[in-house]
């Protein structure tokens, strides 16, 4: 199975992978060569989501997609509270190319206010969080509508995380098995 590379200009998205630089909850880059990949089925859903967002004058910003199993181990080993990090022995939807972390950008390229950043690994990051303002909750619901209308499932603990239904039907992939050369 080959993954599909998601990169402008072929894809009308902004790609800024959080684990490609030090501005993330780990405080260091995880990917030596950050590139964005998805399973072909997830790429099809993403294409629909891009269209739904564009119809509303918005764009998607991708902050993570395929995450090689080596990277999943790095996150797991760094995180004392494992509530928000999938056990790499079972595999994450990201490690199957089946998940994408996204937010919305307005026509000026600024992120819509979601009431917390991507990777807000606290209850504030949950879809049902009560701390965001009504406007911030409306932005989260707008993203939820765009992504689910495109065919993605959502994850209750992360407003930014969308994945294929039944992602465990797909294999966990290492960087080498996927042929992505992200880890170095």
Residues of each region from the PLM?
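Segments that shape or occlude catalytic/ligand-binding pockets
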Residues: 68
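Conserved metal-phosphate-binding beta-hairpin within the catalytic cores
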Residues: 162
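Extracytoplasmic cell-surface/polysaccharide-interacting catalytic and binding patches
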Residues: 1-65, 75-157, 165-184
């Amino acid at each position: 199975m080959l993954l599909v590379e998601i990169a402008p200009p072929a894809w009308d998205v902004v790609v800024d992978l959080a684990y490609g630089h030090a501005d993330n909850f780990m405080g260091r880059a995880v990917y030596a060569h950050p590139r964005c990949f998805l399973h072909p089925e997830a790429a099809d859903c993403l294409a629909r989501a891009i269209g739904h967002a564009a119809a509303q004058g918005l764009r998607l910003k991708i902050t993570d997609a395929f995450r090689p199993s080596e990277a999943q181990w790095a996150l797991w080993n760094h995180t004392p509270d494992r509530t928000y990090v999938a056990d790499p022995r079972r595999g994450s939807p990201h490690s199957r190319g089946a998940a994408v972390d996204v937010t919305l950008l307005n026509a000026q390229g600024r992120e819509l206010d979601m009431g917390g950043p991507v990777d807000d690994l606290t209850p504030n990051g949950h879809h049902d969080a009560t701390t965001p303002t009504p406007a911030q909750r409306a932005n989260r619901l707008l993203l939820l509508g765009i992504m689910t209308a495109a065919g993605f499932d959502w994850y209750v603990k992360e407003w930014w995380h969308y994945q294929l239904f039944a992602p465990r039907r797909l294999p966990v992939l290492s960087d080498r098995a996927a042929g992505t050369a992200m880890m170095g």
